[in-house]
Amino acid sequence: LSPGLSYGKDEELDLENLKKKYAQLQSVGFKDFAIFFDDIESERGEELGKMHGLVMKELSGFLEKDSSSSLMFCPTVYCNSFANDDISNSPYLKGLSETVPNNLPMLWTGKQVVSQYIDDQEVEELHKIISNPIVVWDNYYANDYCPTKFYVGSYRGRNITEKAIQGIGLNLTGLPLTDSINLYHLKGDMSTEEILKEFGVPQDFNVLMPFFDGPFKNSPELNTLEDIQNLINLSQELCVKWKSPLQLEWSPYLW
């Protein structure tokens, strides 16, 4: 649930409504829950952090009545850049750390919303501010901020170990087969070429691959009209001759 846009106008009533929603979901079999306080257009101050921590404390106590339930959360400050690149002086994280139960996993995207690199040292710096277990909420393959693109290249720039984090969650595209390719990348035991072959992608796509590799890979320069026309012809050929469910996902991006 994402209650942050309106939460706080009547805190007591809002909290009771949240508990009712969770109880309703529990009654039909849901066990694992998350609260998202991201993308709230308000000052990221200490009082907001304290309030969010108290909400999590109340919900955690409520859900603990069912020992099989789990709860995690995404804070409003979920990357370094939202703390002006200085998490040690973030009023929001300070307030949050004072009230949130420290056993609840917290989502974090790294230095940026879409981070080029994430490593253990960054997580260690975060743990100096707040001790909650960290789940990396990784936007490496996300395309909601660039809906005319998708990425299916290798999973790069991550040097994080199990000792530093509780887990990794990929924020993907919503395209089921494309997302399956990227889950193969996360698993890490096959090359990009092997994965694309596994999914029946024609070899001709390898020519276009540099344009769909990853968010931090520079696309090749197209210096002549002939270069551009050759790519257009290849894209059209893939759209017309290649027939598969994956092609249906990719064709709007290839035309």
List where the protein language model places each region.
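Feature activates predominantly on carbohydrate-active enzymes
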Residues: 1-18, 27-31, 64-65
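A short, flexible beta-alpha/helix-coil linker loop
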Residues: 4-7, 39-43
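A diffuse structural propensity rather than consistent per-protein peaks
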Residues: 11, 118-119, 224
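Bulky hydrophobic/aromatic packing residues
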Residues: 15, 78, 86-88, 208-211
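Catalytic-core regions of glycoside hydrolase
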Residues: 21, 31, 40-190
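C-terminal functional modules
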Residues: 189-255
